[in-house]
């Protein structure tokens, strides 16, 4: 990795209070990229904008940790990259091997299995095929509409509801319509009929971020990637450390630089997308969160006992000192009275 040009600023700000030197950034980048030596697409590299501003760019791992349901958009929208504000595509040199925005977006795709089923020969379909459906997270792509009520025969008075095979053109049109309404998160496909869901806690995704993007911009980028309607203000980014500590990123934080500072190992720290009101966990409390409730209760009981003992010790010392002071005052008063007489 080449050393940064001397024209770049001497310090790079992680937030309004924290900054790192160019040398520190060089070291962090080198450590990070060596860790992913065999995965060039995960490297974090730097370049400069049209106005000469230093910019660091790469893939950012984000883990799902939301509890509230999220709503997928019904219609896809053209994604607007934050890099449109930069000098593109000349922002980074070819030597930097910077990847394009659309790459590694394999989490957003249409189920090939559904397409194969929809285009399969008619002879392979059985009545059970049209009665089957997938789980809540994956709806059947070629689910056929029901026909009107039909009489079975003239002699039979009972009415039955019959499944009928729709025309081939109709099925293809329906498949195309469903394809427009789908997004996929970690391999699970959703359509407009099951577009409200909660992602599995701890499932991983990636977004392309840079050192110009603050916390809210990264959240917007993630929601845009999966076509999620919820407002970015409903969510926040948290760093969860291996110790159990959980810290909320500020609006002024640069998540990509925070990832660099924590190092490449996910066992040390992970960035989660969570509800904005998720509770933080301090470093003092973190060591106790994995203990059993009965054990924690015994610790509290022991602390209460120690507190009572300490209070009793302090009160005893206070009473002793108070008695000594009163005794001294009384002796001085007695001596003064004798002198006066």
From Swiss-Prot:
InterPro entries: RA_dom (IPR000159), RASSF1-6 (IPR033614), SARAH_dom (IPR011524), SARAH_RASSF6 (IPR049787), Ubiquitin-like_domsf (IPR029071). The keyword Phosphoprotein applies. The keyword Phosphoprotein applies. Pfam families: Nore1-SARAH, RA. Keywords: Apoptosis, Phosphoprotein. The modification Phosphoserine is found at residue 155. GO terms for biological process: apoptotic process; positive regulation of apoptotic process; regulation of apoptotic process; signal transduction. Residues 190-278 form the Ras-associating domain. Coiled coil: none annotated. Residues 285-332 form the SARAH domain. Involved in the induction of apoptosis. May act as a Ras effector protein. May suppress the serum-induced basal levels of NF-kappa-B. Interacts with MOAP1. Interaction with activated KRAS is still a matter of debate. This is Ras association domain-containing protein 6.
């Amino acid at each position: 990795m080449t050393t940064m040009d001397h024209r770049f600023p001497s310090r790079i700000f992680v937030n309004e209070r924290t900054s790192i030197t160019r040398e520190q950034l060089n070291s962090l980048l080198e450590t990070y990229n060596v860790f992913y030596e065999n995965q060039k697409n995960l490297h974090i590299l730097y370049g400069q904008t049209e106005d000469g501003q230093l910019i660091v760019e790469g893939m950012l791992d984000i883990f799902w940790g939301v509890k509230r349901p999220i709503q997928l958009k019904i219609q896809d929208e053209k994604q607007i990259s934050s890099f449109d504000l930069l000098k593109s595509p000349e922002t980074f040199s070819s030597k930097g091997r910077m990847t394009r925005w659309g790459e590694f977006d394999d989490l957003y795709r249409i189920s090939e299995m559904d397409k194969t089923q929809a285009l399969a020969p008619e002879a392979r379909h059985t009545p059970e095929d049209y009665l089957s459906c997938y789980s809540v997270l994956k709806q059947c792509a070629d689910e056929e509409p029901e026909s009107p009520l039909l009489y079975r025969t003239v002699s039979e008075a009972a009415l039955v509801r019959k499944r009928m095979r729709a025309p081939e053109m109709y099925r293809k049109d329906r498949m195309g319509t469903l394809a427009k309404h789908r997004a996929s998160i970690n391999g699970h496909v959703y359509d407009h009929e099951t577009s409200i869901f909660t992602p599995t806690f701890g499932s991983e995704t990636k977004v392309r971020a840079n050192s110009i993007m603050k916390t809210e911009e990264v959240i917007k980028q993630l929601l845009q990637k999966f076509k999620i309607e919820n407002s970015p203000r409903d969510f926040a980014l948290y760093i969860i450390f291996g110790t159990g500590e959980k810290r909320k990123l500020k609006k002024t934080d640069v998540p990509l630089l925070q990832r660099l500072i924590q190092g490449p190992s996910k066992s040390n720290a992970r960035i989660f997308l969570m509800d904005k009101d998720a509770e933080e966990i301090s470093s003092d409390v973190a060591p106790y969160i994995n203990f059993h409730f009965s054990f924690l209760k015994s610790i509290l009981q022991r602390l209460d006992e120690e507190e009572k003992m300490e209070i009793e010790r302090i009160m005893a010392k206070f009473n002793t000192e108070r008695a000594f002071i009163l005794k001294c005052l009384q002796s001085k008063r007695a001596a003064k009275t004798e002198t006066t007489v």
